[in-house]
Curated annotation (Swiss-Prot):
The keyword Ion transport applies. This is ATP synthase subunit delta, chloroplastic. Gene3D superfamilies: N-terminal domain of the delta subunit of the F1F0-ATP synthase (1.10.520.20). Belongs to the ATPase delta chain family. It is a peripheral membrane protein. Keywords: ATP synthesis, CF(1), Chloroplast, Hydrogen ion transport, Ion transport, Membrane, Plastid, Thylakoid, Transport.
Length: 203
């Protein structure tokens, strides 16, 4: 086992334990996991962040300052403290592995679902995410009750449904639901309707 993998395992489990111990209910735990996903989204779209963390010429203090400047006002203090700890222990260079193993462990051992809501670009488009979340959460919970094999070591009575929102150019109107965990996409966009109509006309 590589050093990267060993560090990733240890700190990923530590992060999951901290999030569970520091939250008193389902909603707060879900919000914290959502913050982790927000961090992952930015981290994955900005390769220079990983390069910065991996650069040994920058001190732990400089890396912590970067985290504060970039994420300090948007991420939960619990998650920020964990990231600061990684800087102090010089394990921040393994952040990609740690987050990957954390999400893999979370999804494997709980009845969790990640849903990416894809919307058109533009300020004029509005989608009631809270209403959509309520609808899908109820759907997932219904499935959970019918699935005796579901494993949930965190002992929550509800399915953990984590939403991320992604703007997609060219989507026109409507929206798409990308069920990341289940590898499914449901297309409610105008572009999707046009595509289905074209398929019928070309039949």
């Amino acid at each position: 086992m590589s050093t990267n993998s060993r560090a990733g395992d240890a700190y990923a489990y530590a992060l999951l334990k901290v999030l569970f111990n520091e939250t008193k209910d389902f909603d707060s735990f879900s919000d914290l996991v959502g913050d982790v996903l927000d961090f992952v989204t930015i981290f994955n779209t900005c390769p220079s962040i990983e390069e910065f963390f991996a650069n040994p010429t920058y001190s732990p203090i400089q890396k912590k300052q970067f985290l504060y400047d970039f994420f300090g006002r948007s991420l939960n203090p619990i998650l920020m403290s964990f990231l600061y700890l990684l800087c102090d222990t010089k394990r921040i260079i393994y952040i990609s592995s740690i987050i990957s193993i954390f999400l893999e462990t979370l999804l494997k051992n709980t009845n969790s679902h990640i849903v990416e809501v894809q919307t058109p670009t533009g300020k004029d488009y509005k989608l009631d995410i809270s209403k959509l979340e309520t609808t899908l959460s109820g759907w997932f919970n219904k499935i959970q009750k019918n699935n005796d094999e579901a494993v949930n070591f965190l002992n929550f009575d509800e399915s953990l449904v984590i939403f991320t929102v992604k703007e997609v150019p060219g989507l026109l109107g409507g929206f798409r639901l990308n069920f990341v965990t289940d590898s499914k996409v449901i297309d409610f966009s105008i572009a999707g309707k046009i595509k289905r109509l074209a398929a019928v006309l070309n039949y």
